[in-house]
Each structure stands twice: as C-alpha cells, then as structure tokens.
C-alpha cells in the first residue's frame, strides 16, 4: 500500500538542493590490504515517486529497479573484495538487518561521531556465525520525478528540477572483530534513479577513497 513520505519528503527535497556528493573513507586503523574477505549483505533501498506534482509516494517499482541497477553496477565494479553474499531466508532476521542498515545511515547523516557508532547486533551476530570479520552494507534511497516539477507541500508553488530525481547512497564496511566501522562513504546525486549511469557515477564516487 502506498504511503506519503512525511518528514522524509522534506529531507529528500533538502538533499536534492544540497551538494551533489559527500565522502569520507577509512575511519579506523584498518587499511584496504587488511580486507581480504568481505561478506555483502542485501542492500537497503527505499525510493519514492512524485505523483501529480504534489507528493512523494512510496513506490516499489522504482525501489526495485533502483536496487537492481545499483547491485549490478557494484558487482561489475570489482573494487571491493566481496567473497560471499549473505542471503537471509528468515524474514524477521532480514527485516532486522535492513532496519540496522537504515539506522546506521541516519546516524551518519546526522553527524554522529563514527567512533560512537558500533556494529549493530544482528549484523554482528551473522558475521560472527560465519567466521567473517568484515561486512559490506549498502544503502540507497531517493525519489524519481518524471515530470521534472515538484510542488511545495506548503505553498503549492511549482519547483522545477534540473534532473529527474535524486539518489542518496552509502557504502559502509563494518568490523566484527573490533565492533566498529572501518569504511564510510556517502554520495548524494541529482540524477535519474532509473538509469544505470547514475550508479556508475555514484559507485565511482563512493569508492574513490577505497582505491587510494
């Protein structure tokens, strides 16, 4: 069932007009050479679509397409040493992992010090049970605006967009040994979330510090 984005709508519009990119990199003593095995969790994705130039509505079709495009481009990139993909069949556990990824992105966006962000319990437990130290978490969200126009919820004044939407992505690598984050990168891009080129650009940006 479709639901209107509430506070999320305001956040997304604000992000759209913010800088196109933000990046960090390695945030612990771990280096690229230390990461020989990396387990990738299912990415968290959440997209909306502007309907009738008035509201951003949750849209499963946009979400699924954007998720598939990002995953395909990330797999083609080959920068990260992903050695396994973690598939979770238990819906309760899967939902917990998705929620933990979502909250980690919220902490990062709200400038919570990285040293104060610990690996979430469900993700940590899964990595430990597989005897894998490092886990890859991916977040992707935003909205699609097919008409290129959005009407402000308060005034109804049309706001023209130069692009057909916005994507907000993050790549986070966590360490189950020391229970912390080792790599954090975020990217906000004013671009169509239904085009593969959007994610080629975004992944290049997200991993530029990893490649150094």
Predicted regions and their residues:
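C-terminal/domain-edge helix-coil "capping" segments
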Residues: 20-49, 125-134, 139-212
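Sec-dependent N-terminal signal peptides
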Residues: 6-11
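N-terminal segment of the mature soluble domain
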Residues: 52-137, 184-186
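Positively charged n-region of N-terminal signal peptides that target proteins for export
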Residues: 1-4
